[in-house]
């Protein structure tokens, strides 16, 4: 019998569990973290952010990572008049990645092509609700996320806005998403 074995995550170390989650009651943080390349769909994240900021200005956007589209994304944010709400901290690794997840209210992975994509699982482990593209492989095993087509910037913007303004939805996906990902371990995948 043949079956697909999806990726999983290791339980968070105590060091990463102990990273504090800041209070963002006044201002929300929405994050893209990954390679800033065409495959990852960063332009859709910037365009969705532009739509969100037409409805609410108490939201900041972070595009963490590096890649050949970095300069173009900085320019696109400036062209859309949202550069003051955008941060580009560059490449992250190790503990920095988990600090970014814990400091975020929403994680967005708008990938055009993504065989799996482990980042949403890592974000959800940290209690950060995630929005993923329907075209990502991890969407096959994740239910406690919001899924949109990568090209549908209006649906992505609506999802971001909803998570930033609806505490009940945020709390549900925060708690249930963490439970779901905590059950996707390498041990359980190996027992299949």
List each language-model region with its residue ranges.
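Carbohydrate-associated surface elements
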Residues: 8
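Conserved donor-binding/catalytic core segment of Leloir-type glycosyltransferases
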Residues: 22-49, 174
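Nucleotide-activated donor-binding/catalytic signature segment of Leloir-type glycosyltransferases, i.e.
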Residues: 74-92
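Short alpha-helical donor nucleotide-sugar binding micro-motif in glycosyltransferases
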Residues: 91-92, 99-104
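Aromatic "clamp/platform" in nucleotide-sugar-dependent glycosyltransferases that forms part
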Residues: 112
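Short hydrophobic beta-strand element within catalytic cores of glycosyltransferases
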Residues: 129-132
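Conserved acidic donor-binding segment of nucleotide-sugar-dependent glycosyltransferases
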Residues: 145-154, 162-167
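A charged, aromatic-enriched C-terminal amphipathic alpha-helix characteristic of glycosyltransferases
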Residues: 168-192
